């Protein structure tokens, strides 16, 4: 007996359902991203209209000033002189052409990060990484995982971190998370608020030339009244510049929300910030890595050590000093 073929309407039922669903998902995602971008551009235009944010330079405007004594690429070529290398005894000149226009990092090379910490060690006073979130230039979440600290947790700091005991059930080890996170940060311009806290929790030092700490955003604003203090909180900056309320409620901070907000703040002053970076690179062409000695010294501080170990370390230091004298 030859089996009957399925009706034509039944055969094409699955494709007709799956394809529109996929298109609908992509269409909704595009609309959501477009609305977010429109809100961001509206805030930026409002700040520029109020004079809180300077307008970007128009095409064809005057180039950035050349530092005194610097030799431009044109002058060097016309003179026929070879530019000395840094450290060869002569004055080093830039490896880059004279900047006529500040170009920021490509969106694919710019990410924002935020970390949440819990308390370990004596009295829970040692901060260790418990959650890390990384978002892209456009606000897409690239990484968001809970992380199990290397030492037992004494204080979850839920009011601020939002971390609870239940979150640790699905947490990954710190060493695994560290490798995954540093792989995402490598070669990227990293944006964040008070980044030294995040990098210290990661036990990592990022190049200064690729770091954009949003605590310095007020420095790029033309309104002096916003220069209230040296370190303005992310919550205050979001409210003043983005008209956005964050870190509300009793469930603690969201590292995804904080990272996204930091990226929005950076994009408000991106043109001015990258112009300044271009000037500093032209003045000091060699991308010097940060001096990690000061960061390592923080890990060697004994202020959180048990009393017996701290007493022994201080006693040993005094004995060594006496022997040198």
Swiss-Prot record:
Pfam families: RNase_T. A motif (Nucleolar localization signal) lies at residues 27-35. It is found in: Nucleus; Nucleus, Nucleolus. Residues 110-266 form the Exonuclease domain. Residues 53-105, 281-325 are annotated as: Disordered. GO terms for biological process: intrinsic apoptotic signaling pathway in response to DNA damage by p53 class mediator; response to ionizing radiation. Its main location: nucleus. A motif (Nuclear localization signal) lies at residues 165-188. The keyword Nuclease applies. Residues 56-66 have a biased composition (Pro residues). One of its GO terms (cellular component) is nucleolus. One of its GO terms (molecular function) is nucleic acid binding. Residues 308-325 have a biased composition (Basic and acidic residues). PANTHER family: APOPTOSIS-ENHANCING NUCLEASE (PTHR12801:SF57), RNA EXONUCLEASE REXO1 / RECO3 FAMILY MEMBER-RELATED (PTHR12801). Exonuclease with activity against single- and double-stranded DNA and RNA. Mediates p53-induced apoptosis. When induced by p53 following DNA damage, digests double-stranded DNA to form single-stranded DNA and amplifies DNA damage signals, leading to enhancement of apoptosis. This is Apoptosis-enhancing nuclease. The gene is AEN.
